[in-house]
Amino acid sequence: MIDWSLCPAVERHPEKVGGSWVFRNTRVPVVALFENLESGASIDEFLEWFPGVNREQVEAVLRYTIESLGTDRSAA
């Protein structure tokens, strides 16, 4: 499981979206990015559909995910 607390592009507040991790200063859950990518959407489409999220945030989340998965792999 990824510890999102160190990713600067996201935040979590109990009063926002039930405490889910969201893109900073939005109510867009981080999981929405991965669900849309899994369904075949492009990053540009995601950004169009969720205008509160910017490209830098998406890139930061993807980089953080890759780094976290690399850390998990080296710990195994």
What are these regions (language model features)?
Residues M1-V28, F34, G70-A76:
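Acidic, low-complexity/disordered tracts enriched in E/D and polar residues
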Residues T26-A76:
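Long, charge-rich, low-complexity alpha-helical segments
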